[in-house]
């Protein structure tokens, strides 16, 4: 997760992260969102008292609000590829970021998976390295 702003956002790189995040209202995801949980844990761990400007229910809504100049947010890089390439959004350099998170496949213990779900799980398990290289290697440049 990275701190992002629109292309017009100017941040003094010498400013401390706690000062920055305490003074600039942020755009949050909704309660229960894994992005929000990670974001709030980061701020709690750093002793940062952030101000919430907006709370939105999807990464797409947050992204569009950031592009429109409504504020900054801490967002997952995976959903920002096109906006970074078009320079609609920029990553703001902040000490302590990015926040590294992991994705997991989950299912109910003891539930019999459908043939399609079983095939999908097997495919992802067998092909995860190739999937990562083919689809997400661009992330390494950030």
Where are these regions (language model features)?
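Short secondary-structure boundary segments
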Residues: 7, 77-79, 95-96, 103
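Hydrophobic hinge/microswitch elements
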Residues: 38-92
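Residue-level signal for nonpolar/aromatic packing positions in well-ordered secondary structure
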Residues: 3, 20-21, 39, 105, ...
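Flexible hinge/capping segments at coil-to-helix
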Residues: 1-31
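Alpha-helical segments flanking ligand/cofactor-binding loops in enzyme cores
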Residues: 18-19, 63-64, 118
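Residues embedded in well-ordered beta-strands
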Residues: 2-4, 25, 72, 90, ...
